Amino acid sequence: MNINDNLSINSPVDNKNVVVVRARKTDTVFKAFKVAPNIWVAPERYYGESLSIDEEYKVDGGIYDSNFLSQDSEKDKFLQAIITLLKRINSTNAGEKLLSLISTAIPFPYGYIGGGYYAPNMITFGSAPKSNKKLNSLISSTIPFPYAGYRETNYLSSEDNKSFYASNIVIFGPGANIVENNTVFYKKEDAENGMGTMTEIWFQPFLTYKYDEFYIDPAIELIKCLIKSLYFLYGIKPSDDLVIPYRLRSELENIEYSQLNIVDLLVSGGIDPKFINTDPYWFTDNYFSNAKKVFEDHRNIYETEIEGNNAIGNDIKLRLKQKFRININDIWELNLNYFSKEFSIMMPDRFNNALKHFYRKQYYKIDYPENYSINGFVNGQINAQLSLSDRNQDIINKPEEIINLLNGNNVSLMRSNIYGDGLKSTVDDFYSNYKIPYNRAYEYHFNNSNDSSLDNVNIGVIDNIPEIIDVNPYKENCDKFSPVQKITSTREINTNIPWPINYLQAQNTNNEKFSLSSDFVEVVSSKDKSLVYSFLSNVMFYLDSIKDNSPIDTDKKYYLWLREIFRNYSFDITATQEINTNCGINKVVTWFGKALNILNTSDSFVEEFQNLGAISLINKKENLSMPIIESYEIPNDMLGLPLNDLNEKLFNIYSKNTAYFKKIYYNFLDQWWTQYYSQYFDLICMAKRSVLAQETLIKRIIQKKLSYLIGNSNISSDNLALMNLTTTNTLRDISNESQIAMNNVDSFLNNAAICVFESNIYPKFISFMEQCINNINIKTKEFIQKCTNINEDEKLQLINQNVFNSLDFEFLNIQNMKSLFSSETALLIKEETWPYELVLYAFKEPGNNVIGDASGKNTSIEYSKDIGLVYGINSDALYLNGSNQSISFSNDFFENGLTNSFSIYFWLRNLGKDTIKSKLIGSKEDNCGWEIYFQDTGLVFNMIDSNGNEKNIYLSDVSNNSWHYITISVDRLKEQLLIFIDDNLVANESIKEILNIYSSNIISLLSENNPSYIEGLTILNKPTTSQEVLSNYFEVLNNSYIRDSNEERLEYNKTYQLYNYVFSDKPICEVKQNNNIYLTINNTNNLNLQASKFKLLSINPNKQYVQKLDEVIISVLDNMEKYIDISEDNRLQLIDNKNNAKKMIISNDIFISNCLTLSYNGKYICLSMKDENHNWMICNNDMSKYLYLWSFK
């Protein structure tokens, strides 16, 4: 789809792409710009809301500014920002299909007859008399278009109401609250009855916020609004009252449920629908069946009355045709989770609104195109350099609760705010009142495939549909917009026991001069608020231990200090403790109790947790509500049925009961998810905020120290500049350690939630299920016993076939349930921590060799065009022939420093014999960094820091012309250097003396004097363990090994029989002919032909297993050992002299793993066509593929 980007606020009105139109039901006019067919942008505040809002109606977290978007310069920036976002959405196939569908999905037109209008659910009268027979006939037959008249509802009208412009959506600026995005319908009735109605979107493109470590992408926020617009355009909007319980909010005696609108649930996607809406769907409502019916009704009207009606323009018909190419389920399955993957956008996996209660959003400014382009954030979602908005000071502060922490004298120590989640709440227990229906069919089946629901959207066809120029307007196409305003109140709670929110607040400070303290009471009692609560015991001990030391006045002292701050922070924040439990929790985050006063403990959290169990971490511990169920009574009219008919009907009932058990199961599952897991999720969120608060404190301490040295020390400007760069990288490394801590929290609390389910919920559930099953079994047996037309044996047969003998249902299996929970709850909100910084690949194209990086880090690569490729250990390898060839990899991730751990591994085959020093790979600047080079027939790994401290490790035994797997692991936390050759640890050295190795962001792979093969060069941002080295080494080797017929590794010097793939039951034998011995299959059942015994001989005598592209000699064991040669007629023959034997290349088959190929001089060894009584082994490339395949048994 073409997005019109040739527009500005000053573009002249042309009544085509730039128009002045009237807002619905008002006298307001605005300038609108058509950016795509039926898609308009109005760079104005939304007209439907007053920009002057009384304080009591302002919502918590909102920002109100009546002057926003009032200047033409702002309006132009808004227009360009929306165009940029639409172009970004349009840049992927999925996004282009979404926009094409929105452009096409026009509301259903109204029928017109003699001054009256008709829609399937509505008729109004103009001047036509009511006795008109044709009109009455129309009404009774419900045919909307007998006379080909129609009126359209999707249009904008000019100021004088004489010109009309087709429109499906209009994107405005925000309404009164400038940080609220919204999607509103034009006409409520048509939004729900299948007719469809156009949509208005309010949108704020200039402000975003952070979620964990990444910024929310405005493109995904706009996609959310666009998806919602389809519900209005198709007329399938559900009732506003269709809500489901989302999470329990339980504080002291107050218990409320947050409720989530069904559209928000469907559109958000992610984890929530997998539990709340898992098929079969236990929560039934008429919405799904009714919406599907009105959708099908209108598609049927289109197909029968419009598609073939030549009096209706193609601009209308073709759009309706494309609109109805998709099914209603396709719309229900459009969600942000799908689009986030299509755009590689990070987003929360749970509905965003439910995350606001534990912290306050801070908004960041987005400047287009400086910070954001059609490719997204210029520096990525995590590293985007966005400034905090000045508007944060205007955020409305209306907490849901205020927690007053009082001391023993009832003096207030602190006030902490708990904010709402933006959702409606209710005190009604949905589950205790909801009756699970028995006979209702499943309302909606989710599509579990990975296929796009937009597959039926044909972009090419849609692009060629003529635009709607002449609009026949239906004047009653809209309702007056009525904004919903509500008054919110705040309740206050007094407590002497600190709540988690109190502890969380104590970890934040605005004081520039602060000190860390582990004494919470001391912190909240301090008069000047200079103390900040921290649970980082190692950090505080270190800071206390050096307070009397001499001041830091050199770069080396600063590096030593900075390194220790980093190491101690890492030890504190990533600390866990192994424990033993009966339900799978084997690791506890030790600081969790200290951070949030969980269990009201200090150092004894782990012990208390072991004593009280995982249930002790949350407030609600009551039993789940037993669902109200219906039971199916077997009708008495079945008593007289013949045996077969009776058995069939009883089996149908049996199947219905099984499905009903599933409904009960999902009801329990949903209660657990809503009432129990939601509380653990709250703890996860608060614990992560605590991690980020501690991280912020440590970073402020570091930045304060660096600022002081920059302004007050005698350190040279060059060294200060280097210290500044190094500190930036260390701050990044601190964030990485925080992410590890947050992952630990995820794992711990998710496991705790699963433990509660297994220990507290599942037994009650199974007990209830047993009651249900027993009751059904009793009724079934009683009914069968009452059947008088069958004998006792037949009754027993029916009982055995139609009663439930046990709870042996797959969906009741606890292990299956735990696997489901583990897969869906692990790492719910995480930064995508892909550890690979460089993954080198190479492959051949016709006339060109391609070298690239598969890490996804957008590495810039420059390389000599004459670098050759050869087949390596497992794929194409680089051939550096020693003629000053080079490859340069550039990426900010490659910058080293003081605290970053990293690993390097690659496969190397050294072809050189020289002893002269020859560089291989490195990252150095101003003689600082790391490097690997050849020297004295070995390999040297060198590290040198900015202060001249150096470490050199010499590695021998890599110059024997064989492949070796080189792994180098630099662990800055353990101050340890590990080096492996193949699967052997050859160096374990301390690097405590090595400080800052800051170097450029370039890694160079060189070939100065030494020819070599390099394959699989990989750089990781973490150290590598011995177990990982072994795993990597043998994984690659396993892929490269040739396999025998049993999939075992083929061995040198081991005796085998040889078979051809085509004749897999006939071994290769020896046949004498003309004083020569040739090889053939025994296809005559000649008992004198015995299977030959083969042995593979390696060129390398130390090699045990055969690998791809090895050169091999094949010997045949007879009375004396013979060797394979190739005769003049290309047959394989046996000779006595090993020196004259042919060296063949052995490889495996990609598709048949236990088969191999043999080749000589580029020709394959194959089996000939039958020659008299023989199929000879020959060297020839003209045979069928499968005749080239061999197998050793």
Curated annotation (Swiss-Prot):
The 133-Lys-|-Lys-134 bond is cleaved during long-term storage; the cleavage site is masked in the M-PTC complex. Keywords: Disulfide bond, Virulence. The keyword Transmembrane helix does not apply. One of its GO terms (biological process) is proteolysis. Residues 830-1193 are annotated as: C-heavy chain nHC. Residues 409-829 are annotated as: N-heavy chain nHN. Gene3D superfamilies: 2.60.120.200, 2.80.10.50, Clostridium botulinum neurotoxin b, 'coiled-coil' domain (1.20.1120.10), Metalloproteases ('zincins'), catalytic domain like (3.90.1240.10). GO terms for molecular function: metalloendopeptidase activity; zinc ion binding. Assembles with botulinum neurotoxin type A (BoNT/A) and protects it against pH-mediated inactivation or protease activity at pH 2.6 (the pH of the animal gastrointestinal tract) but not at pH 6.0. Necessary for neurotoxicity. Forms a highly interlocked heterodimer with botulinum neurotoxin type A at pH 6.0 but not at pH 7.5, called the minimally functional progenitor toxin complex (M-PTC) (BoNT/A, botA). Belongs to the botulism non-toxic nonhemagglutinin family. This is Non-toxic nonhemagglutinin type A. It comes from Clostridium botulinum. The lineage of its organism: Bacteria, Bacillati, Bacillota, Clostridia, Eubacteriales.
